[in-house]
Every structure is written in C-alpha cells, then in structure tokens.
Amino acid sequence: MYKPDKETALLCYRMLARTRALNTVLELKRHRIEGPVLTGLGAEAISIGIGMALLRRGILKESLLNGNQRTQFGFGVIKDIAFSDDHDHGYEILKNHALVATATSQGEDGNIHWGCLDHGILPFANSDMGRMIPVLVGMAEEMRRVRWPQIEDARKRPVAIGDFGEGALNQGCIAEAMNWVAASIVV
C-alpha cells in the first residue's frame, strides 16, 4: 500500500480543503445563484485522488481532464497547484457560479465552465454530462497517435481521464465512446 511522505500528504490535504471550500461557498450562497447549484457532496475527493496519482507519475501537466459537476473544480485545483502560475482555474469556476461579469461565461450561466485547453482541462459545457466524453476520447486518440510515439517510456505518457455518472451512461454517445476506446486497444 502506498504511504505518502509528509509533503505529499500536506499537498493532498491542501487540495481537498480548497475543493471543499468551493462547495461550502456555493451552499452558503445558494439563494443568490441562478439555476441549480451543482455541488460535489463529497465526491469532489475523487478528482484529488486522480490528480495525486498523475502528479506522482509526473504526467499531470500533459494529461487531459474532463470533469463533471462534482469533479470539475477539483481538476482545476489540481492543475492550479501543478502549474503554480498566475492562472487560477478554481477562481474562474467560482466566478462562473457567482455570475460575475468578468467570468468566462460573462455572468450569464453559472453551471458551465469553459475549461482551459492550454492546461488540459476540458469544458463543462452543458448539463448533459456525457456529451463531452466523445470529445475527450477524440482528443485522447490524437494524443496517442501524435504525442505518444515521441515518449519512449510508456509510464511517462500522458493520459485522458473523464468521469460521468450512471445517468450519463444511458446516453448513446457514452456507449459509442467506450466502444471506440475498446476497439482501439492493441492487445
């Protein structure tokens, strides 16, 4: 069983605390936010585990992440910490929820986030969570064909991770995306 060192454990705690803080703010400000308030309800911790694994492997920066309403902010937090530059994905997501005019949605819709393709975060562009999975699969296919051949060590190749709930699994686009991935695997 993996036992993180103190520095890694503190980093994980920092990411979890920051992710939980957004959900707490959303719950407290719920009456001021138009439309449904999509909070993590604790499930946001999933994104932190994924991010820690990618960070430990050294492939977080290059990997693609596509979250749903529960994990999008966590993926933003992870990338913020990994890149440690002036681009604050978490703050951008919070501005969207609060309908701030300078947010990427220009104050129009708090339940979408345009992501950040420069940093490998796909948009959370509609409430039909599964619709972005085929896009992620297409981007992953391009990554496999173009970028992977340049990286000799298979353990250092970036990956694409998307998540969705059981409701989205009923959509045909999810089944087709999973079929494409399964058919693409070389045995």
Where are these regions (language model features)?
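Cofactor-/ligand-binding subdomain signature composed of acidic, glycine-rich
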Residues: 1-35
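Cofactor-binding active-site loop characterized by glycine-rich and histidine/acidic residues
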Residues: 24-187
